[in-house]
Amino acid sequence: MQPPPMRERQRWRPEEDAILLAYVRQYGPREWSLVSQRMNRPLHRDAKSCLERWKNYLRPGIKKGSLTDDEQRLVIRLQAKHGNKWKKIAAEVPGRTAKRLGKWWEVFKEKQQRELRDRDRRRLPPPLDGDERGCAGGRYDWLLEDFADKLVNDHHRRMMAAPILPPWMSSSPSSSSSPSVTLSLASAAVAPAPAAPPPTWGGGGGGEVVVAELMECCREMEEGQRAWAAHRKEAAWRMKRVEMQLETERACRRREATEEFEAKMRALREEQAAAVERVEAEYREKMAGLRRDAEAKEQKMAEQWAAKHARLAKFLDQVAACRRWPPVEINGGGGGGPGGGR
């Protein structure tokens, strides 16, 4: 008999589930390749699909629907303990399969990451407009311009505070005065000292180096902020996991304490019932012993009374036998009397 062609991967229909359930009720959960042959109804599914359908959806005892809060906390705690070993985790979560728990964990992790991304997006400052960002076009160009302005102003203030003096004014006070000094003061043909060239920011080579260093610092700051944001997001996610694990452990400990208390109460009740049963058994045994003793005493007294009655009857019989006259003597006495002599 040729096996039926396999159906393409699609959802199971209710009639296919009914065929599979009827087969399991009749033949048990084994030999899945013989479902169509034994049930005389075409089931276009291979043995592996039938096994997975039975094990993950149709097997008795499997819970359907969303996980409860206690189950979610338990799965989070077990995942932190065992990792992604879902078969091992499913063994400790009754009514849930490894496939179901793995799918729930993927959805839960994606949801947590999406919430963290949304939260970080709300916390980041809004980007600046094009006219506010300057010529560089970066996020921190306004900071670069501020740094450049501060450097230019500081340099200008230092230059104004320390002006360049001519050589004849910067001479030491210990030098002796000479007529050349008076002549140099009165002479108008003395050439003035050359003025210091103003600093060129942005046009000279030194300004370009400073701007490049500032740009590099800004890039490093931006990379540092990205790394810090990623670390912060990871830390927030781990913190939330730790909080959920702590809550799960707290609930588990509370449940374990409740179960332990109930177990102790059951043990006390059982011990009390056993003690009552022992007392009742001892009472019944003592009552039975007293009843047996009473019956034995009564029987003994009855036997004694019967023996006394027998001895008394025997004694009476003996007394009666001793007082009875023999009939020969009575007749002889009558013949020897006066009437007999006649």
Curated annotation (Swiss-Prot):
Any single biological process term in GO: negative regulation of DNA-templated transcription
Domain HTH myb-type: 1-58, 59-113
Annotated SUPFAM superfamilies: Homeodomain-like
Residue ranges for the DNA-binding region feature of this UniProt entry: 32-58, 86-109
Keyword Cytoplasm: no
Keywords on record: Coiled coil, DNA-binding, Nucleus, Repeat, Transcription, Transcription regulation
A GO CC term attached to the entry: condensed chromosome
Domain of life: Eukaryota
Pfam families in the cross-refs: Myb_DNA-binding
SMART domains registered for this protein in UniProt: SANT
Gene Ontology molecular function: any one: transcription cis-regulatory region binding
Compartments, record wording: Nucleus
Function noted in UniProt: Transcription factor required for normal cell differentiation. May interact with other proteins to repress the knox homeobox genes.
Full protein name: Protein rough sheath 2 homolog
Source species: Oryza sativa subsp. japonica
Taxonomic path: Eukaryota, Viridiplantae, Streptophyta, Embryophyta, Tracheophyta
Gene behind the chain: RS2
